[in-house]
Amino acid sequence: MRSFGRTGGRPLSPRQKTLMAEKLDTYRIAEGDGPLDLCAMFPGKEAFWLEIGFGGAEHMIAQAAQNPDVGIIGCEPFLEGIAKALGGIEETDLNNVRVWPDDARPLIARMPDQCLDRAFVLFPDPWPKRRQHKRRLVQADFLSILHPKMKPGARLRFATDVKSYADEALLTFVSDGRFEWLAASPDDWRCPPQDHVTTRYESKRLGDCKPVWFDFRIR
């Protein structure tokens, strides 16, 4: 079951259409069923990170610019987000970002075991109605797909501004037993982490609570 709705939104601008036509193939991960070779995808990079649902790509582009030795894979099914990522990659002259314009789960399945040093799931679609909760990304089956791909000791960050999703996701992570919650005090989830990059979506405060950030270490 998809954890996102329609993949179209507002029409792309002429510049965005040009980026999609001319640059997408350069930065897109090729479709297929075969395993991914991250070392070949990111020659010389020392670590590999994954961002699932990067939205307007502000966080991903900033992290890539601040961490040039890291190869970052971003997954985003919405075309406008992909176009914004391509624009950010070109404007910042990055060589350490690749994008996947579809559901993250099939791509994660193609990754080698214990290859990821870090993962971000920031403000995913909250599916706020109770009958929609089954569509939320953070479920036990999703963790079973993601966990084997992360190195022992790797970090995962989840953020949301929807209280029911915060409660549900935290319970899902902690109940799994393979994700160690790193909070030592309430400020650790109430305050943005030091390396967090605020996005335009986050600034809109569309949820029903203040943003929370949960950081986990992989066991």
Swiss-Prot record:
<feature type="binding site">
    <location>
        <position position="125"/>
    </location>
    <ligand>
        <name>S-adenosyl-L-methionine</name>
    </ligand>
</feature>
<feature type="binding site">
    <location>
        <position position="161"/>
    </location>
    <ligand>
        <name>substrate</name>
    </ligand>
</feature>
<feature type="binding site">
    <location>
        <position position="129"/>
    </location>
    <ligand>
        <name>substrate</name>
    </ligand>
</feature>
<dbReference type="GO" id="GO:0008176">
    <property type="term" value="F:tRNA (guanine(46)-N7)-methyltransferase activity"/>
</dbReference>
<comment type="function">
    <text>Catalyzes the formation of N(7)-methylguanine at position 46 (m7G46) in tRNA.</text>
</comment>
<dbReference type="InterPro" id="IPR055361">
    <property type="entry name" value="tRNA_methyltr_TrmB_bact"/>
</dbReference>
<comment type="pathway">
    <text>tRNA modification; N(7)-methylguanine-tRNA biosynthesis.</text>
</comment>
<keyword id="KW-0819">tRNA processing</keyword>
<dbReference type="InterPro" id="IPR003358">
    <property type="entry name" value="tRNA_(Gua-N-7)_MeTrfase_Trmb"/>
</dbReference>
<dbReference type="InterPro" id="IPR029063">
    <property type="entry name" value="SAM-dependent_MTases_sf"/>
</dbReference>
<feature type="binding site">
    <location>
        <position position="76"/>
    </location>
    <ligand>
        <name>S-adenosyl-L-methionine</name>
    </ligand>
</feature>
<keyword id="KW-0489">Methyltransferase</keyword>
<feature type="active site">
    <location>
        <position position="125"/>
    </location>
</feature>
<keyword id="KW-0949">S-adenosyl-L-methionine</keyword>
<dbReference type="GO" id="GO:0043527">
    <property type="term" value="C:tRNA methyltransferase complex"/>
</dbReference>
<feature type="binding site">
    <location>
        <begin position="199"/>
        <end position="202"/>
    </location>
    <ligand>
        <name>substrate</name>
    </ligand>
</feature>
<comment type="similarity">
    <text>Belongs to the class I-like SAM-binding methyltransferase superfamily. TrmB family.</text>
</comment>
<protein>
    <recommendedName>
        <fullName>tRNA (guanine-N(7)-)-methyltransferase</fullName>
        <ecNumber>2.1.1.33</ecNumber>
    </recommendedName>
</protein>
<feature type="binding site">
    <location>
        <position position="51"/>
    </location>
    <ligand>
        <name>S-adenosyl-L-methionine</name>
    </ligand>
</feature>
<keyword id="KW-0808">Transferase</keyword>
<feature type="binding site">
    <location>
        <position position="103"/>
    </location>
    <ligand>
        <name>S-adenosyl-L-methionine</name>
    </ligand>
</feature>
<dbReference type="Pfam" id="PF02390">
    <property type="entry name" value="Methyltransf_4"/>
</dbReference>
